[in-house]
Amino acid sequence: MKRDLYETLGVQKNADEKELKSAFRKLAMKYHPDRNPGDQESEKSFKEINEAYETLKDPQKRAAYDRYGHAAFEQGGMGAGFGNGFAGGGAHGFSDIFEDIFGEMMGGRQRRSSGGRERGADLRYNMEISLEEAYSGKTAQIRVPTSITCDVCTGTGAKPGTSPKTCGTCQGTGRVRAAQGFFSIERTCPTCGGRGQTIADPCTKCHGQGRVVEERTLSVNIPAGIEDGTRIRLSGEGEAGLRGGPAGDLYIFLSVKPHEFYQRDGADLYCAVPISMTTAALGGKFDVTTLDGTKSRVTVPEGTQAGKQFRLKGKGMPVLRSSQTGDLYIQIQIETPQKLTKRQRELLQEFEQISSKENNPESTGFFSRMKDFFDTLSE
């Protein structure tokens, strides 16, 4: 029996893309054939890891696996409850499985019912927001051009006063069988195009499609703490279904614009702040404006070194759907003076002359240890 793909990668079933990639890289490094030459078990594990990752990183393949397990990818192989034949007795064949799944996923093929009803396609809308908007959350108005149910024929596709008729070729199934040698092949009905119905007198507004294109304005609630790459689903806001079929969904893909001052890592924020050499040496204070619009004071003690971090607790990003908040880390950068005047140069030279080892313990100790090291080598 094949191993569970999530178990193979060592992740939970709700693992996100980042967790999948991290687990894959870690295991791939461990079992890579170049690191384990001649080890057949490692080679086998490496192949299993690759297969698991290739399946789970693809949203459609992952949905197929979650629903049907390994049976979704086995030609002619049926999972429990799928029946015995590939195309006989009303059982789902390999292609039918994918029609069921992908008809519900991101614009895949829709499976037609015997009444000619088709589910509308899912739609994607890309939205870019600022870090400030991700911090506070917002309700955004978006305009989406999409197909909606025709208001003249109410989605039937037929002229008012008439109705679609059951296709006489396929008897409403949308599929016909044709014998070819020893095989019986099922294909889309050429008369109705797989809809199971024919329209003798189509609606003049939608031309028999049952829907028309229109731009709609929708409200999208973006919660505080939303992260870059988050997907928001608006159920039933995709394309209208055909001939009374259910509407698809609208997926909002969010991207957060890079910020001029802040970098984000989960719920924590990082900001590099340059200070003068004298402030670092003598100490000082400065204010930082945080994303909530308030100012926080940072106290720099004398002798502060470059790279020193100060933590402002609770001044980071809100955690999505939680009362918790991340922290803001201020990283100190020391700016070396440039374009010195003659007097400034003289003062710095004088400072250098009167400085002692105690003023610069790190550099003094470093060069002393380096000298001792090379002296030892030359002995």
Curated annotation (Swiss-Prot):
Zn(2+) 2 binds at residues 167, 170, 189, 192. CXXCXGXG motif repeats lie at residues 150-157, 167-174, 189-196, 203-210. Pfam families: DnaJ, DnaJ_C, DnaJ_CXXCXGXG. SMART domains: DnaJ. GO terms for biological process: chaperone cofactor-dependent protein refolding; DNA replication; protein refolding; response to heat. Keywords: Chaperone, Cytoplasm, DNA replication, Metal-binding, Repeat, Stress response, Zinc, Zinc-finger. InterPro entries: DnaJ, DnaJ_C, DnaJ_domain, DnaJ_domain_CS, HSP40/DnaJ_pept-bd, HSP_DnaJ_Cys-rich_dom, HSP_DnaJ_Cys-rich_dom_sf, J_dom_sf. GO terms for molecular function: ATP binding; heat shock protein binding; unfolded protein binding; zinc ion binding. Binds 2 Zn(2+) ions per monomer. Signal peptide: none annotated. Its cofactor is Zn(2+). A zinc finger (CR-type) spans 137-215. It is found in: Cytoplasm. Its main location: cytoplasm. Zn(2+) 1 binds at residues 150, 153, 203, 206. Residues 4-69 form the J domain. It comes from the Bacteria. PANTHER family: CHAPERONE PROTEIN DNAJ (PTHR43096:SF48), DNAJ HOMOLOG 1, MITOCHONDRIAL-RELATED (PTHR43096). NCBIfam families: DnaJ_bact, PRK10767.1. Participates actively in the response to hyperosmotic and heat shock by preventing the aggregation of stress-denatured proteins and by disaggregating proteins, also in an autonomous, DnaK-independent fashion. Unfolded proteins bind initially to DnaJ; upon interaction with the DnaJ-bound protein, DnaK hydrolyzes its bound ATP, resulting in the formation of a stable complex. GrpE releases ADP from DnaK; ATP binding to DnaK triggers the release of the substrate protein, thus completing the reaction cycle. Homodimer. Belongs to the DnaJ family. The J domain is necessary and sufficient to stimulate DnaK ATPase activity. Zinc center 1 plays an important role in the autonomous, DnaK-independent chaperone activity of DnaJ. Zinc center 2 is essential for interaction with DnaK and for DnaJ activity. This is Chaperone protein DnaJ. It comes from Rhizobium meliloti (strain 1021) (Ensifer meliloti). The gene is dnaJ.
